[in-house]
């Protein structure tokens, strides 16, 4: 006999140990719920109830930990297998309450996870991970998946130093079949896994979950085209929440969905004939059970023929069997469809089109203009976020201000972003110049060549893309822009370490991959004022491409140019900020500030160093570098970028010039040659060895003062 909590005065009652697993679970859940109600909520306030009229679960959010009696019994997907549909619906409600409660205390990606709660429950109920592979595209929506796969107890650490990653990560869990962070990769990965399965003689299922936004990228269509040709069994779940661009795309709320795909999906959603025929097929299936396959298939075939004038959907033209649209918040429908697809002997690639709502079930997210896509800590009762006050704006906002000033002075200035208006600051530009701002969807390759076409016709395009996302369009940067010397301006946001988003979003490589191009001008500002000047510099460069990088986070409080209108800098010229002797620190980008702080620390050791701001990696200020090398014993370059970046260019020049043949000691400080995990920015810089303390210790060591260096390090 086992003792379980009860609503009786003794609070315990016996459950026979020979009770079958399903009945035993129901008794445990009911007992836990009764106990929670009796003690005022136990660890959490009872905040969920099922409404009799609609059958829907009503969640009353508060700051208290929710009572989750059913979720408490689910540690891994195996614990969900015997749950009934009503229990799965209750599990989804508890999971939604758990996510809101957890993310309210940690921050993170909220609304995308709330939108796929029922999907995650249905997938893990029907399929058997980690044998079956579920690949979440991008990964913003993976929180319910993480909770259901053994990581609930660590969710309070998500996106924090040494905590859970904000995205699926293969070395975090066997249930994370493929790492994510960037968009539109899941179908390609799923197809590779499906083909590998077939070659190895395995029988597992492979499922890709991809949003309509990710479907705007060319890679998704390349993968679907190939999957239709290879005809391997796999399932693509298209999560259609009408979010082709992130909901922060404009200042007025969600952007109008971009491209023909969104129109096609809307037609599919609104097809009355299709919906009626789907319901007819479902009714036939329920009526004649196991013999329904042939009859239902005929009805389904007819339904698919109604979708377009040509008698098929785009997906079927690519070789995928299309099912949908399906209510993505109906556990019953999702489970039924997944079970049907799972039981089909050789379906080839199947696309299940589900319709969901971002932020579903949490009223503040449903009502918010940005759907609470990415949030800091917030009050779960109201949704009000606890944003820290800062006397300065973000670098992104300073960039936007400067670009607006350039556009006011020159009507040829235009802005391009890849579904990231809010992230890149071009939502501000769009508000001022809606006809000169272009959201091309999650399509960095297209964005770059589109900008090249604009430049070829005499416009002045600024292509604003995160440093890590520009990697996706690199061949276009080389072949379509740099080779032709077209004056496209690249504003590379989120350069360097990015904190909680981790290595998938870290902008470590842009200096290396841009400065190796023969025609590219490569800049990095030391502060927000310099950023404004570099925007003006890029606007003035009209005979070749240019780029400038800037970090996540806020400015340092530098004195801004009048009216926030920058002044073009002399291309390829740096500046000396502090004069000294023996030692020179040559900083690139925001590491100039770390060099200044290191110089202050070194004064306490009687060392007065020269601090210079390189400004340009290409072309280098060779005159400044030669002067620093000739007049100092030690030269240290400092950058927040990878090996092969600014320091490499300086070392290469000094080597070719013979300036390393003498007594000069040269050291380059840069990001370590490995990926740095997510965490607080201060922790990441510490791990990378790029704090002012590390710079000062390096100088002391080079000057033959190892004990003092050791005390600092």
Curated annotation (Swiss-Prot):
It is found in: Plastid, Chloroplast. Pathway: Metabolic intermediate biosynthesis; 1-deoxy-D-xylulose 5-phosphate biosynthesis; 1-deoxy-D-xylulose 5-phosphate from D-glyceraldehyde 3-phosphate and pyruvate: step 1/1. PROSITE patterns: TRANSKETOLASE_1, TRANSKETOLASE_2. Pfam families: DXP_synthase_N (PF13292), Transket_pyr (PF02779), Transketolase_C (PF02780). InterPro entries: Dxylulose-5-P_synthase, THDP-binding, Transketo_C/PFOR_II, Transketolase-like_Pyr-bd, Transketolase_BS, Transketolase_C, Transketolase_CS. Its cofactor is Mg(2+); thiamine diphosphate. The keyword Magnesium applies. Catalyzes the acyloin condensation reaction between C atoms 2 and 3 of pyruvate and glyceraldehyde 3-phosphate to yield 1-deoxy-D-xylulose-5-phosphate (DXP). Is a limiting enzyme for plastidic isoprenoid biosynthesis and essential for chloroplast development. Homodimer. This is Probable 1-deoxy-D-xylulose-5-phosphate synthase 2, chloroplastic.
């Amino acid at each position: 006999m086992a003792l379980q909590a009860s609503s009786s005065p003794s609070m315990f009652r016996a459950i026979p140990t020979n009770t079958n697993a399903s009945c035993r679970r129901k008794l445990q859940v009911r007992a836990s719920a009764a106990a929670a109600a009796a003690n005022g909520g136990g660890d959490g306030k009872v905040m969920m109830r099922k409404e009799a009229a609609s059958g829907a679960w009503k969640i009353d959010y508060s700051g208290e930990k929710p009572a989750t009696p059913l979720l408490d019994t689910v540690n891994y997907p195996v614990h969900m297998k015997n749950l009934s549909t009503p229990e799965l619906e209750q599990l989804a409600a508890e999971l939604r309450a758990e996510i809101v409660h957890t993310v309210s205390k940690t921050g993170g990606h909220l609304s995308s996870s709330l939108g796929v709660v029922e999907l995650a429950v249905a997938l893990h109920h029907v399929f058997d991970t980690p044998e079956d592979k579920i690949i979440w595209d991008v990964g913003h929506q993976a929180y319910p998946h993480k909770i259901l796969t053994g990581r609930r107890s660590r969710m309070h650490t998500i996106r924090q130093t040494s905590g859970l990653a904000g995205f699926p990560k293969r070395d975090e869990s066997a249930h994370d079949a493929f790492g994510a962070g960037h968009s539109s990769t899941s179908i390609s990965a799923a197809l590779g896994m499906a083909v590998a399965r077939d070659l190895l003689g395995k029988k597992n299922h492979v499922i890709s979950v991809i949003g309509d936004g990710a479907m705007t990228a060319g890679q998704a269509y390349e993968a679907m085209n190939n999957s239709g040709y290879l005809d391997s069994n796999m399932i693509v779940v298209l999560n259609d929440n009408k979010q082709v661009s992130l909901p922060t795309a404009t200042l007025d709320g969600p952007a109008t969905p971009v491209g023909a795909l969104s129109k096609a999906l809307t037609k599919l959603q609104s097809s009355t004939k299709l919906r009626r025929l789907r319901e007819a097929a479902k009714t036939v299936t329920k009526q004649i059970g196991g013999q329904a396959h042939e009859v239902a298939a005929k009805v389904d075939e007819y339904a698919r023929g109604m979708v377009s004038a040509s008698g098929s959907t785009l997906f079927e033209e690519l070789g995928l069997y299309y099912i949908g649209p399906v209510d993505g918040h109906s556990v019953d429908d999702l489970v039924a469809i997944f079970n049907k697809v799972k039981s089909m002997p050789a379906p080839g690639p199947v696309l299940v089109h589900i319709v969901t709502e971002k932020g579903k079930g949490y009223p503040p997210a449903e009502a918010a203009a940005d759907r609470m896509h990415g949030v800091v800590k917030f009050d779960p009762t109201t949704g009000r976020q606890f944003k820290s006050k800062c006397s300065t704006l973000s670098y992104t906002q300073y960039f936007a201000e400067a670009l607006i000033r350039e556009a006011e002075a020159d009507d040829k200035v235009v802005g391009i972003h890849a579904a990231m208006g809010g992230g890149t600051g071009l939502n501000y530009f769009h508000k001022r110049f809606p006809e000169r701002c272009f959201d091309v969807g999650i399509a960095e390759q297209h964005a770059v060549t589109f900008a090249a076409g604009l430049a070829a016709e005499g416009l002045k395009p600024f292509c604003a893309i995160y440093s890590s996302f520009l990697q996706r369009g690199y061949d276009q940067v080389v072949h379509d822009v740099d080779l032709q010397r077209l004056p496209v301006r690249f504003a590379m946001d989120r350069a360097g370490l990015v904190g909680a988003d981790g290595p998938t979003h870290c902008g470590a490589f842009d200096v290396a991959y841009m400065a190796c191009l023969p025609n590219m001008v490569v800049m990095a500002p030391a502060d927000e004022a310099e950023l404004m000047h570099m925007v003006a510099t890029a606007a003035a460069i009209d005979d070749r491409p240019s780029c400038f990088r800037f970090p996540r986070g806020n400015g340092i409080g530098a004195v801004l140019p009048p009216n926030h209108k920058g002044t073009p800098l002399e291309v390829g010229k740096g500046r000396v900020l502090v004069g000294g002797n023996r030692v020179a620190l040559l900083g690139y980008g925001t590491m100039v500030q770390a060099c200044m702080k290191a110089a202050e620390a070194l004064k306490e050791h009687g060392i007065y160093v020269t601090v210079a701001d390189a400004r340009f990696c290409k072309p280098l200020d060779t005159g400044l570098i030669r002067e620093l090398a000739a007049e100092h014993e030690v030269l240290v370059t400092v950058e927040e970028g990878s090996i092969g970046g600014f320091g490499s260019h300086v070392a290469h020049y000094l080597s070719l010039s013979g300036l390393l043949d003498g007594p000069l000691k040269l050291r380059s400080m840069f990001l370590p040659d490995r990926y740095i995990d997510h965490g607080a920015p201060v922790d990441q810089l510490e791990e990378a060895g790029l704090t002012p303390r590390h710079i000062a210790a390096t100088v002391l060591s080079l000057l033959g003062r190892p004990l003092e260096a050791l005390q600092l390090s």
